[in-house]
Amino acid sequence: MITIKRKFPFPLLYLVIEDELPPQFISCKQIKMNKVVLFPGLKRNISFQYVIDTIPRGEHTFSSVRVKTGDLFGMMEKEVTFSVPNTFLVYPQYVDIAYQQLENHFEQGVLSANINSAKDSTISVGVRDYKPGDRFSWIDWKATARTNNIMTKEFEQQRSHNIMIFIDRTESPLFESVVTFTASIVRAVLKQNSPASFVSIGKEQTIFPLDNGDTQLQQILCHLAKVQADSVFPLSQSVDMELRKIYEPVTVILVTSNLSPDIQKAADCAAIRNRKCMVFVVKEKANQLSHREISIIETLKKRQIFVNTVYENRYTNVFFEVSK
């Protein structure tokens, strides 16, 4: 809403008010709604508001408002631009994803021991809040009585379920979909209070160390709100460099829209270092994989690297689909 207050009720025949929009808004359908002609007369307070339904993600600044008036015959016109900077951040879109399926997938897969059968014979190393799907035998009754909340034993295997997410910032017409899917995965993982680190390397290098909780989520979403497709180095180089710094068990997730030889090399880097690896390839719709991409998928699957092609607006059960 734009409000103009006048000290003196001088009669105005008309008033043209235009809110100058950021350049990113040029393609918005509602762009003409930022300009209005009013007939204020003697009113001291003049207001108008408009709504932009679709705003691109990013940091946007509304810098100024242009006001114009004149007489009935057009012999006199007066135009003034007021500087009223206002900056706000638009977070990326996201979709609710059932992250629990990721743990089930690795527990059933060939890349790790079957935790379901091993937990009973494993020494617990701590306690945590109960989660749906936890066994009755895992409940720590002493901790439950002490905290008045149902507490579950935490095992060493569970602590090894750290996630390391890489976003491919290579220029692509599907980059916005890559950002949306990445934001969805990050949110799903951290909302389950699972530790996650995030690596985003383009013209600038942004790395969020292993952590969990809402603060980590907000920081990563803030970065994804402003991230650009400006990759300078191959993703495989970033993966290899970052994995050299990590010694604890970690599951690597790569998000891309183009399953290139470099992405294959990045997945191989993770596998060589005995890291579990999942590759998500974002496409607009089905049957858009090239012959090269299909060949790379077959090669990676032979190396027990999990690959899943995901499509726009169909992200909800991506982990469940991989585990089939």
Model-derived features: positions:
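An amphipathic, basic-hydrophobic helix/alpha-beta surface used to engage anionic
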Residues: M1-D211, T251-V255, C269
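Exposed, interaction-prone extracellular/peripheral surfaces
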Residues: P132, F136-K324
